[in-house]
C-alpha cells in the first residue's frame, strides 16, 4: 500500500502558501529569510527584486493558461524562492553562465543562488615527469 504525503511548509499546504500575502509568508519563515523578504518587499528598497517578481508572475500566469513560459534569467542570487514560483524554471547566473533551476515545493524559503553553484569540483590529472621528487628516479620512456 503506497501512501502519498502532501507537501507542507511549516504546517501549511502549497495552496495555502500561494494565497498568503508576502508579509504573512515572512512571519512563518526563518529569521534570515524573514528579514530579507521584509527588507525587499516592505521597504521597496530593491527595484531589481520587484522587476523579477513581476516577470515571475507574468510567466506563472502564462503557464496556468497553458502557453509557453518565457525564459526568465536573473543575476539575483539572493532572491528567496516563493510559493508562486513553484513549477517555473529560472536561469540563475553563477558568474560564468546561466544555470537552469527547476523550482519545486521543497525549495521554498531557500535562495536561488543555493542551486546555481559558483565553483565546480577540481579534477586533477595525472602528475607529470618532474612533478615530484620521487619522479626523478622513474625511467624515461
UniProtKB/Swiss-Prot annotation:
GO molecular function annotations of the record: rRNA binding; structural constituent of ribosome
The gene that this protein is the product of is rps19
Q: Which Gene3D superfamilies does the protein's record reference?
A: 30s Ribosomal Protein S19, Chain A
Q: SUPFAM superfamilies given for it?
A: Ribosomal protein S19
InterPro entries for this protein: Ribosomal_uS19, Ribosomal_uS19_CS, Ribosomal_uS19_euk/arc, Ribosomal_uS19_SF
An example Gene Ontology cellular component term from the record?
cytosolic small ribosomal subunit
Q: Which NCBIfam families match?
A: PRK04038.1 (NF003121), uS19_arch (TIGR01025)
Q: What is this protein called?
A: Small ribosomal subunit protein uS19
Keyword terms of this UniProt record: Ribonucleoprotein, Ribosomal protein, RNA-binding, rRNA-binding
Amino acid at each position: 500500500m503506497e501512501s502519498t504525503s502532501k507537501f507542507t511548509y511549516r504546517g501549511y499546504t502549497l495552496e495555502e502558501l500561494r494565497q498568503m500575502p508576502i508579509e504573512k509568508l515572512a512571519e512563518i519563515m526563518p529569521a534570515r529569510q524573514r528579514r530579507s523578504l521584509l527588507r525587499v518587499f516592505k521597504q521597496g528598497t530593491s527595484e531589481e527584486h520587484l522587476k523579477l517578481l513581476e516577470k515571475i508572475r507574468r510567466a506563472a500566469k502564462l503557464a496556468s493558461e497553458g502557453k509557453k513560459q518565457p525564459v526568465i534569467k536573473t543575476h539575483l542570487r539572493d532572491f528567496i524562492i516563493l510559493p508562486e514560483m513553484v513549477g517555473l524554471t529560472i536561469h540563475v547566473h553563477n558568474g560564468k553562465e546561466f544555470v537552469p533551476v527547476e523550482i519545486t515545493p521543497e525549495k521554498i524559503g531557500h535562495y536561488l543562488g543555493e542551486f546555481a553553484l559558483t565553483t565546480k569540483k577540481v579534477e586533477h590529472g595525472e602528475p607529470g615527469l618532474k612533478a615530484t621528487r620521487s619522479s626523478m628516479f622513474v625511467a624515461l620512456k
